[in-house]
Amino acid sequence: MDRLFEPLNFRHGPAMKNRFMLAPLTNLQSHDDGVLSDQEFKWLTMRASGGFGLVMTCAAHVQAAGQGFPGQLGIFDDVHVGGLARLAAAIRHHGSLAMVQLHHAGLRSPPDLIGGHPLSASDDEKTGARAVSYT
């Protein structure tokens, strides 16, 4: 039990101040365009100030067509950089490490949410998903 409060060293990068990590939670707090909201910023930085050694965001979609749920954090456009940089700095200010969970909902992206058919690793007749290709 005492080891929970000891630093955790990694081969590369900074050490965690302790072994407590905030798991990525689905909190539905971001703006419709994926920009971090003030509410989500406050919620996550409160976890850092509360003593977590690492604070991880919710699943952040890496492509607009990969959004899985309303209020999901985005990390696919320059418009997201300011909020994410501000969040990382605030988390580090409290001595915690900041981490983003990367996510793409694939064929589970709701068509009404993404405004079209979902993208997937391969075509799927049942859902109308089409394979991602970059030709």
What do these predicted ranges mean?
Residues 18-24, 45, 98-102:
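A structural motif
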Residues 47-59, 83-132:
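Glycine-rich, aromatic-flanked loop segments that form ligand/cofactor-binding clefts
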Residues 52-77:
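Aromatic-lined carbohydrate-binding/catalytic grooves of carbohydrate-active enzymes
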Residues 31-46, 73-92:
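Glycine-rich anion/phosphate-binding loops
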Residues 1-24:
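N-terminal amphipathic alpha-helix/helix-capping segment at the start of soluble metabolic enzymes
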Residues 135:
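Conserved small/polar residues in nucleotide/adenosyl-binding loops
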Residues 35-37, 70-71, 113-116:
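Short, glycine/charged-enriched secondary-structure capping and boundary segments
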